[in-house]
From Swiss-Prot:
Function as written in the Swiss-Prot or TrEMBL entry: Part of an ABC transporter complex involved in ferric-petrobactin uptake. Probably responsible for the translocation of the substrate across the membrane.
Coiled-coil segments: none
Protein name (database record): Petrobactin import system permease protein FatC
Native source species: Bacillus anthracis
Xref: Pfam families: FecCD
Disruption phenotype: A mutant lacking both fpuB and fatCD permeases is incapable of using petrobactin as an iron source and exhibits attenuated virulence in a murine model of inhalational anthrax infection.
Protein's UniProt keywords contain Mitochondrion: no
Amino acid sequence: MITLDYRNKENVEVDSSLHNESRSASAFRSKKEARRYWIVLITLIALGLLSSYGLLVYNNPVPIDSPSFIPVVKRRIVAIVAMIIAAVCHSLSTVAFQSITNNKIITPSLLGFESLYSAIQTSTVFFFGASALINFNGIGSFLFQVVVMVFMSLILYGWLLSGKYGNLQLMLLVGIIIGTGLNSVSTFMRKLLAPSEFDILQARLFGSVNHADPAYFPIVIPMIIIVAVLIFAHSKNLNVLSLGKDVATSFGVKYQPSVIYTLVLVAILMSISTALIGPLTFYGFLVATLSYQAAATYDHRYIFPMAFAIGFLIMTSAYFLMYHVFHAQGVVSVIIELFGGIIFLTIVLRKRAL
């Protein structure tokens, strides 16, 4: 039997590389990575604010000393607020959704929110005409769309995630099937529309901050703040859930209730963003993918702020470049979706497997 005399320091060998000053028991592997995180985050926020300032005052047709300058800026502030809402909703929901599914290439769009939004808009034009779609606005119509999308997701979760044989992968599969079916029905109805009705509908189906009505903000902003705080407070559980069901269960996390709780919060954020701005399929994926690379940590307390900063910068810089550099007044979301789709295909082709 071999015994060690721990009273004699010469008999104990300590690996000094594990206890140097550059390493610490935190979300980052070293203090250098922590400093890098904060530098990147502050830089992204500063660039986002600079782009926002450019959108507000650059190329403003009204002089600053004119009484009409403030009203013009106020109208532009509405677009900035809509960009912040889109960044919060898509960044938080996509990162949380990818964590509970343990898959970095899928997005909450698989649950059919955008397909349902498209079906609601298309059926309104198809059955009641373009005038009904134009009049389909106000707080009542907005809340109706949000409630319908959240209600559909709750039915999906309660049906496929409850019980002994609840399965997250089955829920995703059913969500894809429902989304595909709704898209097929919407496409069929759009083919039967008159050209003028189709043009009006198509403008609604492209995601744009110009669709945002400031009358919705007093309802939307408090809802988003509450949900964002709840998701951020859920960060430690998401850290464990991202390791998989078996590991999360072994750590004492109630897997099924935690997943359903997260999915409900994701559904609320996605429903609000889709009803307010419109569909943005690959925007959340683009933001989440870049945030993982920039944050260099698996701690959601740090991933969420980085994702929001990147999402806000993408939105503000894209609109600034398209409006004031390229002078293209088209739908900026198409460009964002294009880059998001290219990155998605690149990652899929590089991994060769989902």
